[in-house]
């Protein structure tokens, strides 16, 4: 085998190895989540929406958010993003499908809309430890029971 091919293969292998070792796993401990959640609860108490969100990770085509809701907020539709929700604590009802009411652009991201609610959607009760996947383009609405709060992780993945 010619020397230039051997050197090229060695360079490709080394570059691949460097790329693999440059990316390290990201760990969020239970204690870290509790701290972040406590801070977001305090923030949510200070705003009329009773909603606070913190970005934990952002890798471009996927990201992780920690969300706290003290009461029901807007319905959402994400044209380009699928959501996977893990309920960290609390009970909520997820309404999906149907028709968004008073749908409007959220003004901050292309393809993202908000609404005052959903009519004719299906309701799924979710509890601590539950996980649900919401494909891109599906309207969804998190309803929180009165006088309770909920915290959940949202794993967002860009629809390709």
Q: Which residue ranges define each predicted feature?
A:
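Positively charged n-region of N-terminal signal peptides that target proteins for export
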Residues: 1-4
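Bacterial N-terminal signal peptides
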Residues: 6-16
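A short, N-terminal "cap"/entry segment at the start of jelly-roll beta-barrel domains
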Residues: 18-80
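A short local loop/turn or secondary-structure capping micro-motif enriched for an aromatic residue
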Residues: 74, 102-104, 160
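His/acidic/aromatic-lined binding-pocket segments of jelly-roll/cupin-type domains
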Residues: 76, 83-86, 123-124, 132
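Short beta-strand segments in beta-sandwich/barrel cores
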Residues: 91-94
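Short acidic-glycine-tyrosine-enriched beta hairpin
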Residues: 99-136
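Ligand-binding loop in jelly-roll beta-barrel domains
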Residues: 125-130, 136-160
